Amino acid sequence: MEFKDLIASLNIDAVLPEAIIICSSLFILIIDLIFQRRANAVLPYMAILGLILSMLSLLFQWNGKEVTAFLGSFQTDSLSIAFRLLIALSSMLCVLLSIEYLENSKKTLSEFLVIFLTATLGAMLLCGSNDILMIFLSLETLGLCSYILTGYMKKDIRSNEASIKYLLIGAASSSILLYGFSLLYGLSHGHIEIHEIAANLIKDQNGNSLASLVALALIIVGISFKIAAAPFHQWAPDVYEGAPTPVVAFLSVSSKAAGLMLATRIMTILFPYIINEWHNIFQILAILSMAIGNIIAISQTNIKRMLGYSSIAQAGFLLVGLLAGNINGYSSMLVYMLIYLFMNLGAFACVILFSLKTGSDQIRDYGGLYLKDPILALCLSICLLSLGGIPPFGGFFGKLYLFWAGWEAGSYLLVFVGLLTSVISIFYYIKIIKMMIIKESPEVSFAIKNYSQKRWSIKDITPIEVSILICVIGTTISGIFVNPIISIAQQTVIDSSWLMAI
């Protein structure tokens, strides 16, 4: 085969979105080396431009066709494109809300952006990975960058502690996942492409063997860590509290999106003959996540830690869609992931803005915020109400579609637990909203008494305020136009032939 034929067979254009992100990272490094601190003002917008171009290239690829690239190690299909688009969008919003945060902390901007874009690259590659080697390399790219970003505030003890905990638990989960992959590699006689592994398991009647069950258990442990599903959630509260808030916002969405896409691809292709076993395991994980996340969140006094436990519960809700195992199930998972992106990033953006003004992440310090900054209080309230599943915001319709898909699939216990824990979650979200709107002077926090009066204007709008407004609009609009969003999600699932073949 000639060199040009080999290059053509690789289908390099399938990874154009990821190539754009790589070029953006290199360009940021070069500009920073040449102009140094003088370029700090434009570097974030170069990253945003790269992410926008990456999203545009993904939209052009979203045509219902499936393309296999790099000799089978990467596959683009409608579902993977949708998840990659969600990751790129969340990264763009996180860059917007990190600009003021990093300027305030006096940390190097270029290094942060390059590591951040590399983490985004790992998450996007993970969504399209089609062999176990590519999966592991993508997972480690995301993981290693996440550990570095978590400890980016080197002089902050909490950031260092969170980074060490995340590194140790992450390394353990990666080794467990790798051992599961090694079992599949042996059972399939040395194949790494997941469709070939599945074919060999069927051929040798190893699909439901003891070794396959052990591999399944190990892989589920590794994936559950990435999506912060209980009882593999121990890292999440500490990391959410100690890590830089823009990093936490990124991990809360991108890590979940990549992990869910990986779980969908691996479980449906590799383990169709032991579907009852992995359904039962994930059902237990979903119930534990919804219960533990929402119950423990009630007692939290730090808002970032509270959102950490909320994120654990959200992982449980998303697993309801995976377990439904049909068009409505997978599409409801995708719809809720989109809505979760807006409402969760919106909440974190509000937390960052409040923290920059007051230096506090304590829930009690939000008392009376409405008196000094009514727009911020309103935006945070909308995001929290949506997270709690209160109509008419997107979170309500996203949960409704998830639970309907679960009920239709016969997951009655999951739906019951989901509804019950959703009611519990409303309590701690409403508690914060109630504190923000109090007007009695004794109950207004000290932080708010010293809070400078804020008047939002288009003329003086900051990047973090732009991020907040985008998220609030997205949260509201997704509730109004939920039917078209559901239709697009359903068509996305239908166009993914590997999913429909199950």
From Swiss-Prot:
Compartment(s) where it occurs, according to its Swiss-Prot or TrEMBL record: Plastid, Chloroplast thylakoid membrane
Transmembrane segments: 15-35, 42-62, 79-99, 108-128, 132-152, 167-187, 210-230, 253-275, 278-298, 307-327, 334-354, 375-395, 413-433, 468-488
Cited InterPro entries: NADH-Q_OxRdtase_suN/2 (IPR010096), ND/Mrp_TM (IPR001750), Ndh2_N (IPR045693)
EC number(s) given by UniProt: 7.1.1.-
Main localization, broad class: plastid
Reactions performed catalytically: a plastoquinone + NADH + (n+1) H(+)(in) = a plastoquinol + NAD(+) + n H(+)(out); a plastoquinone + NADPH + (n+1) H(+)(in) = a plastoquinol + NADP(+) + n H(+)(out)
One biological process term in Gene Ontology: ATP synthesis coupled electron transport
Source species, domain of life: Eukaryota
Membrane topology qualifier: Multi-pass membrane protein
Family, per entry: Belongs to the complex I subunit 2 family.
Assembly: NDH is composed of at least 16 different subunits, 5 of which are encoded in the nucleus.
Record-given protein name: NAD(P)H-quinone oxidoreductase subunit 2, chloroplastic
Organism name: Mesostigma viride
